[in-house]
Amino acid sequence: MRSSVLRSLRGRLVINLESTRKLRLSRTNIVPGRKKGQKSIKSKNMARKGNPILVRLGKNRSSDSSWFSAEALLGCLYFFIYFVAPTLGPVLFLLRLIHFVWGLRLGLGNENFHFGVGPDGGATGLDLNQPPQEQQPTLGVNRAALDLNELPPVHLLYAEVEGPQSTKAQNDVMLAHLNQVQNLTRDLQTEPNIWRRQALIDILDWEVRSLQRHFRIFRQRDRLREVQRSWLREQLNRYR
Protein backbone atom coordinates (compact mmCIF):
# COMPACT_ATOMS: atom_id res chain seq x y z
CA MET A 1 0.00 0.00 0.00
CA ARG A 2 2.77 2.36 0.91
CA SER A 3 4.74 1.53 -2.23
CA SER A 4 1.79 2.28 -4.49
CA VAL A 5 1.31 5.71 -2.86
CA LEU A 6 5.00 6.48 -3.32
CA ARG A 7 4.86 5.51 -7.00
CA SER A 8 1.84 7.74 -7.59
CA LEU A 9 3.53 10.70 -5.86
CA ARG A 10 6.70 10.10 -7.88
CA GLY A 11 4.70 10.08 -11.13
CA ARG A 12 2.98 13.36 -10.25
CA LEU A 13 6.31 14.95 -9.35
CA VAL A 14 7.81 13.89 -12.70
CA ILE A 15 4.79 15.31 -14.53
CA ASN A 16 5.08 18.59 -12.64
CA LEU A 17 8.81 18.83 -13.36
CA GLU A 18 8.22 18.12 -17.05
CA SER A 19 5.49 20.75 -17.31
CA THR A 20 7.68 23.27 -15.48
CA ARG A 21 10.57 22.53 -17.85
CA LYS A 22 8.35 22.97 -20.93
CA LEU A 23 6.98 26.24 -19.56
CA ARG A 24 10.50 27.59 -19.08
CA LEU A 25 11.51 26.48 -22.58
CA SER A 26 8.46 28.17 -24.11
CA ARG A 27 9.27 31.42 -22.31
CA THR A 28 12.88 31.40 -23.49
CA ASN A 29 11.83 30.36 -27.05
CA ILE A 30 14.17 27.38 -26.99
CA VAL A 31 13.07 24.18 -28.59
CA PRO A 32 14.24 20.99 -26.93
CA GLY A 33 16.96 19.27 -28.89
CA ARG A 34 18.35 22.51 -30.43
CA LYS A 35 21.61 24.19 -29.59
CA LYS A 36 21.65 27.26 -27.41
CA GLY A 37 22.73 29.85 -30.06
CA GLN A 38 20.57 28.48 -32.90
CA LYS A 39 17.43 30.42 -33.90
CA SER A 40 14.12 28.84 -34.61
CA ILE A 41 12.54 28.74 -38.05
CA LYS A 42 9.73 31.02 -36.85
CA SER A 43 12.17 33.70 -35.69
CA LYS A 44 14.05 33.44 -39.02
CA ASN A 45 10.86 33.93 -41.00
CA MET A 46 9.86 36.86 -38.80
CA ALA A 47 13.25 38.48 -39.30
CA ARG A 48 13.00 38.00 -43.06
CA LYS A 49 9.36 38.97 -43.57
CA GLY A 50 8.89 41.20 -40.55
CA ASN A 51 6.46 41.09 -37.71
CA PRO A 52 2.98 40.43 -39.19
CA ILE A 53 1.32 42.96 -36.92
CA LEU A 54 3.88 45.66 -37.68
CA VAL A 55 3.76 44.84 -41.39
CA ARG A 56 0.01 45.33 -41.41
CA LEU A 57 0.38 48.63 -39.57
CA GLY A 58 3.04 49.77 -42.05
CA LYS A 59 5.70 50.38 -39.41
CA ASN A 60 8.31 47.84 -40.48
CA ARG A 61 9.14 48.86 -44.04
CA SER A 62 12.73 48.12 -44.88
CA SER A 63 12.68 50.44 -47.90
CA ASP A 64 10.20 53.13 -46.84
CA SER A 65 9.28 55.70 -49.49
CA SER A 66 10.49 59.26 -49.00
CA TRP A 67 8.30 61.99 -47.55
CA PHE A 68 8.73 63.90 -50.82
CA SER A 69 6.67 61.45 -52.82
CA ALA A 70 4.32 62.49 -55.61
CA GLU A 71 1.29 62.32 -53.32
CA ALA A 72 2.97 64.49 -50.69
CA LEU A 73 4.05 67.06 -53.28
CA LEU A 74 0.56 67.20 -54.77
CA GLY A 75 -0.89 67.64 -51.29
CA CYS A 76 1.50 70.50 -50.52
CA LEU A 77 0.72 72.12 -53.87
CA TYR A 78 -3.01 71.84 -53.23
CA PHE A 79 -2.61 73.38 -49.76
CA PHE A 80 -0.48 76.24 -51.14
CA ILE A 81 -2.89 77.06 -53.99
CA TYR A 82 -6.13 76.94 -52.00
CA PHE A 83 -5.00 78.20 -48.59
CA VAL A 84 -1.70 80.11 -48.82
CA ALA A 85 -1.92 81.83 -52.22
CA PRO A 86 -5.17 83.75 -51.50
CA THR A 87 -3.55 85.37 -48.46
CA LEU A 88 -0.53 86.61 -50.44
CA GLY A 89 -2.52 89.18 -52.45
CA PRO A 90 -2.98 91.73 -49.64
CA VAL A 91 0.60 91.15 -48.47
CA LEU A 92 2.03 91.85 -51.94
CA PHE A 93 -0.21 94.90 -52.32
CA LEU A 94 0.97 96.22 -48.96
CA LEU A 95 4.61 95.67 -49.91
CA ARG A 96 4.13 97.50 -53.22
CA LEU A 97 2.38 100.35 -51.42
CA ILE A 98 5.24 100.67 -48.93
CA HIS A 99 7.76 100.60 -51.79
CA PHE A 100 5.80 103.31 -53.63
CA VAL A 101 5.54 105.56 -50.56
CA TRP A 102 9.23 105.07 -49.77
CA GLY A 103 10.19 105.86 -53.36
CA LEU A 104 7.92 108.90 -53.31
CA ARG A 105 9.62 110.09 -50.18
CA LEU A 106 13.14 109.69 -51.59
CA GLY A 107 12.32 110.46 -55.21
CA LEU A 108 11.11 114.06 -55.02
CA GLY A 109 14.27 115.56 -56.48
CA ASN A 110 16.63 112.89 -55.08
CA GLU A 111 18.37 115.57 -53.07
CA ASN A 112 20.50 115.56 -49.94
CA PHE A 113 20.72 119.07 -48.56
CA HIS A 114 21.23 121.24 -45.53
CA PHE A 115 19.50 124.58 -45.41
CA GLY A 116 21.98 127.45 -45.20
CA VAL A 117 23.70 130.31 -47.00
CA GLY A 118 27.20 130.14 -48.42
CA PRO A 119 29.87 132.88 -48.52
CA ASP A 120 28.63 134.16 -51.88
CA GLY A 121 25.08 134.55 -50.58
CA GLY A 122 23.78 131.47 -52.39
CA ALA A 123 22.05 128.50 -50.82
CA THR A 124 24.34 125.65 -49.85
CA GLY A 125 23.63 121.93 -50.21
CA LEU A 126 24.00 119.04 -52.64
CA ASP A 127 21.38 118.82 -55.40
CA LEU A 128 21.40 115.90 -57.82
CA ASN A 129 18.60 117.25 -60.02
CA GLN A 130 19.38 120.91 -60.39
CA PRO A 131 17.09 123.24 -62.35
CA PRO A 132 18.41 124.80 -65.54
CA GLN A 133 20.90 127.53 -64.78
CA GLU A 134 20.62 130.93 -66.38
CA GLN A 135 23.91 131.89 -67.93
CA GLN A 136 25.44 135.29 -67.41
CA PRO A 137 25.92 137.47 -70.47
CA THR A 138 29.28 137.14 -72.17
CA LEU A 139 31.11 140.45 -71.93
CA GLY A 140 34.29 141.57 -73.65
CA VAL A 141 37.44 142.74 -71.94
CA ASN A 142 36.42 146.40 -72.04
CA ARG A 143 32.71 145.59 -71.90
CA ALA A 144 32.21 147.94 -74.83
CA ALA A 145 32.59 145.58 -77.75
CA LEU A 146 29.16 144.06 -77.26
CA ASP A 147 26.09 145.46 -78.90
CA LEU A 148 23.51 147.12 -76.69
CA ASN A 149 20.77 145.03 -78.28
CA GLU A 150 22.18 141.88 -76.66
CA LEU A 151 20.92 143.09 -73.28
CA PRO A 152 17.33 143.98 -72.35
CA PRO A 153 16.29 147.56 -73.17
CA VAL A 154 16.28 150.14 -70.43
CA HIS A 155 12.51 150.37 -70.10
CA LEU A 156 12.21 146.60 -69.82
CA LEU A 157 15.03 146.47 -67.30
CA TYR A 158 13.47 148.97 -64.93
CA ALA A 159 9.94 147.81 -65.63
CA GLU A 160 10.97 144.45 -64.24
CA VAL A 161 10.85 145.92 -60.74
CA GLU A 162 7.05 145.62 -60.73
CA GLY A 163 6.88 142.54 -62.99
CA PRO A 164 6.28 138.89 -62.03
CA GLN A 165 10.04 138.24 -61.99
CA SER A 166 10.78 141.21 -59.76
CA THR A 167 12.35 141.14 -56.34
CA LYS A 168 8.99 141.80 -54.70
CA ALA A 169 7.40 138.81 -56.44
CA GLN A 170 10.36 136.64 -55.50
CA ASN A 171 10.12 137.73 -51.89
CA ASP A 172 6.39 136.96 -51.87
CA VAL A 173 7.03 133.42 -53.14
CA MET A 174 9.78 132.88 -50.57
CA LEU A 175 7.54 134.22 -47.81
CA ALA A 176 4.70 131.88 -48.81
CA HIS A 177 7.00 128.85 -48.68
CA LEU A 178 8.46 130.01 -45.36
CA ASN A 179 4.99 130.43 -43.83
CA GLN A 180 4.06 126.96 -45.05
CA VAL A 181 7.18 125.50 -43.44
CA GLN A 182 6.39 127.24 -40.15
CA ASN A 183 2.78 125.99 -40.18
CA LEU A 184 3.87 122.43 -40.92
CA THR A 185 6.46 122.58 -38.14
CA ARG A 186 3.80 123.77 -35.71
CA ASP A 187 1.40 121.01 -36.75
CA LEU A 188 4.16 118.42 -36.49
CA GLN A 189 4.93 119.37 -32.89
CA THR A 190 1.29 118.96 -31.81
CA GLU A 191 0.33 115.89 -33.87
CA PRO A 192 0.03 112.67 -31.76
CA ASN A 193 -0.71 110.28 -34.65
CA ILE A 194 2.49 108.65 -35.92
CA TRP A 195 1.18 108.12 -39.48
CA ARG A 196 0.07 111.72 -39.85
CA ARG A 197 3.39 112.84 -38.38
CA GLN A 198 5.19 110.88 -41.10
CA ALA A 199 2.99 112.49 -43.77
CA LEU A 200 3.70 115.94 -42.34
CA ILE A 201 7.43 115.17 -42.34
CA ASP A 202 7.26 114.25 -46.05
CA ILE A 203 5.37 117.44 -46.93
CA LEU A 204 7.75 119.52 -44.81
CA ASP A 205 10.71 117.92 -46.55
CA TRP A 206 9.30 118.84 -49.95
CA GLU A 207 8.53 122.42 -48.84
CA VAL A 208 12.06 122.96 -47.52
CA ARG A 209 13.57 121.66 -50.75
CA SER A 210 11.29 123.91 -52.79
CA LEU A 211 12.24 126.87 -50.60
CA GLN A 212 15.92 126.12 -51.08
CA ARG A 213 15.49 125.77 -54.85
CA HIS A 214 13.65 129.09 -55.13
CA PHE A 215 16.24 130.78 -52.96
CA ARG A 216 19.07 129.57 -55.18
CA ILE A 217 17.34 130.56 -58.44
CA PHE A 218 16.36 134.00 -57.13
CA ARG A 219 19.89 134.69 -55.95
CA GLN A 220 21.21 133.85 -59.40
CA ARG A 221 18.65 136.15 -61.01
CA ASP A 222 19.60 138.93 -58.62
CA ARG A 223 23.26 138.56 -59.52
CA LEU A 224 22.40 138.57 -63.22
CA ARG A 225 20.28 141.70 -62.79
CA GLU A 226 23.10 143.45 -60.96
CA VAL A 227 25.54 142.59 -63.76
CA GLN A 228 23.13 143.96 -66.35
CA ARG A 229 22.55 147.17 -64.42
CA SER A 230 26.24 147.75 -63.79
CA TRP A 231 27.01 147.26 -67.47
CA LEU A 232 24.17 149.63 -68.42
CA ARG A 233 25.46 152.29 -66.02
CA GLU A 234 28.91 152.05 -67.58
CA GLN A 235 27.42 152.48 -71.06
CA LEU A 236 25.37 155.49 -69.96
CA ASN A 237 28.33 157.11 -68.19
CA ARG A 238 30.41 156.75 -71.31
CA TYR A 239 28.04 159.05 -73.33
CA ARG A 240 27.60 161.77 -70.68
UniProtKB/Swiss-Prot annotation:
Disulfide bonds: none annotated. Belongs to the universal ribosomal protein uS3 family. It is found in: Mitochondrion membrane. The chain crosses the membrane at residues 73-93. Keywords: Membrane, Mitochondrion, Transmembrane, Transmembrane helix. GO terms for cellular component: mitochondrial membrane. PANTHER family: ATP SYNTHASE 9 MITOCHONDRIAL-RELATED (PTHR35289:SF1), TRANSMEMBRANE PROTEIN (PTHR35289). It is a single-pass membrane protein. This is Uncharacterized ribosomal S3-like protein AtMg00690, mitochondrial.
